[in-house]
């Protein structure tokens, strides 16, 4: 398979399976979520956000090639930031505060749905333990992220009073960060998936990652749209500022 054909195959996975197609995102971006449904999303998405720099650190610890480490370490800096300026994690907590939550409560991880936690932990262990090709390929959902961030910014600004440039700064910043990150990751996968077996492995890794993202939204829907909140998960009124 040519590089162009493999890239087309990877992009087709996103076209079919990326979580921008999930009903919860349609509900959120269309202005149909209640304030508590938005809060539940912010709380549970934190589990994924907080794991990103840790999974990237785990990935770096496995890389003997300094060129890979140099290219990859900016991902940690994007989310952790500096002591004073912070990064993506601090910007996410700005969103938490804007929707009425106590940022310390959100950062504590209390109230996260069990299924969300399991999905995030599965992703962390996948990146830490699978061959480098699959670990890198699992990051290629970033190919599809700018579109969902654009739709989210537009939808939240249109429909929700909490939304402004400060509260949505995480998504605005990712519009420039994600394309830079994924350009390297995509090139690396196209260079190293050089047999049919490796092409299949790369595609399976991307499918796995789309499943991780989709499962988190399924959990949110079941708990906070259908109303089946499991024991120990966040309930409206908890963790408020």
Swiss-Prot record:
The keyword Oxidoreductase applies. The lineage of its organism: Bacteria, Pseudomonadati, Pseudomonadota, Alphaproteobacteria, Rhodobacterales. This is Pyrroloquinoline-quinone synthase. It comes from Ruegeria pomeroyi (strain ATCC 700808 / DSM 15171 / DSS-3). It catalyses: 6-(2-amino-2-carboxyethyl)-7,8-dioxo-1,2,3,4,7,8-hexahydroquinoline-2,4-dicarboxylate + 3 O2 = pyrroloquinoline quinone + 2 H2O2 + 2 H2O + H(+). Keywords: Oxidoreductase, PQQ biosynthesis. The gene is pqqC. Pathway: Cofactor biosynthesis; pyrroloquinoline quinone biosynthesis. Ring cyclization and eight-electron oxidation of 3a-(2-amino-2-carboxyethyl)-4,5-dioxo-4,5,6,7,8,9-hexahydroquinoline-7,9-dicarboxylic-acid to PQQ. Signal peptide: none annotated.
């Amino acid at each position: 398979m040519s590089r162009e054909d493999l890239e087309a195959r990877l992009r087709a996975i996103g076209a079919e399976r990326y979580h921008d197609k999930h009903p919860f995102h349609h509900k959120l971006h269309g202005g149909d979520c209640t304030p508590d449904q938005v809060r539940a999303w912010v709380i549970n998405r934190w589990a994924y956000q907080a794991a990103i720099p840790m999974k990237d650190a785990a990935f770096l610890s496995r890389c003997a090639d300094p060129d890979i480490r140099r290219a990859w370490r900016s991902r940690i800096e994007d989310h952790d930031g500096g002591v004073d300026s912070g990064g993506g994690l601090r910007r996410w907590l700005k969103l938490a505060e804007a929707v009425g939550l106590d940022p310390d409560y959100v950062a504590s991880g209390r109230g996260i749905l069990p299924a969300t936690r399991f999905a995030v932990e599965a992703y962390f262990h996948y990146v830490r333990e699978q061959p480098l090709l699959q670990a890198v390929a699992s990051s290629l959902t970033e190919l599809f992220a700018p579109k969902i961030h654009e739709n989210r910014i537009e939808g939240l600004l249109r429909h929700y009073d909490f939304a402004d440039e400060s509260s949505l700064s995480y998504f605005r910043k990712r519009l420039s960060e994600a394309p830079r990150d994924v350009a390297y990751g995509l090139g690396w996968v196209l260079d190293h998936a050089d047999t049919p077996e490796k092409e299949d492995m790369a595609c399976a890794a991307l499918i796995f990652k789309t499943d991780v993202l989709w499962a988190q939204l399924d959990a949110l829907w079941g708990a906070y749209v259908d109303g089946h909140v499991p024991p120990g998960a966040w309930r409206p009124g908890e963790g408020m500022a």
